[in-house]
């Protein structure tokens, strides 16, 4: 698809001393509410939670930790690596965020959107030893690093 092709075209993956991390981030924004987290936290009443849309990114605070502890210490690491968490539906992700953040909102399950852009981090894990924590832990971490 166009999304995948555009990502591929922007990735440098065949040069020594160059690493490309393919990932997706979720987290707090400084001046906008364009991302999923800030959008969700700004909503009132009810929202739809996509039961068949799969997400496997990581909180931005965790991505920073990954780079600091699992990329920088490996100067010979090069090429393209996927860095991700355990795949989770957007419905389950929003439900966990609501629980951890104490957000009072109704999340209506919606199965009309079917999308799986999950990543497989096996190669990165084998190269670095990194394995993402479970989603409740990651969301607690994200909540603890509000700006």
What are these regions (language model features)?
Residues 61-69, 136, 140:
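Amphipathic alpha-helical segments that line or abut small-molecule/effector binding pockets
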Residues 10-17, 39-44, 70-71, 83, ...:
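Alpha-helix C-terminal capping segments
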Residues 66-69, 73-121:
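Mid/C-terminal beta-alpha module of Rossmann-like enzyme folds, strongest
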Residues 49-54, 80-88, 127:
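Glycine-rich Rossmann NAD(P)(H)-binding loop
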Residues 104-147:
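C-terminal amphipathic/interface module of NAD(P)-dependent oxidoreductases
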Residues 2, 6:
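Active-site helix of classical SDR
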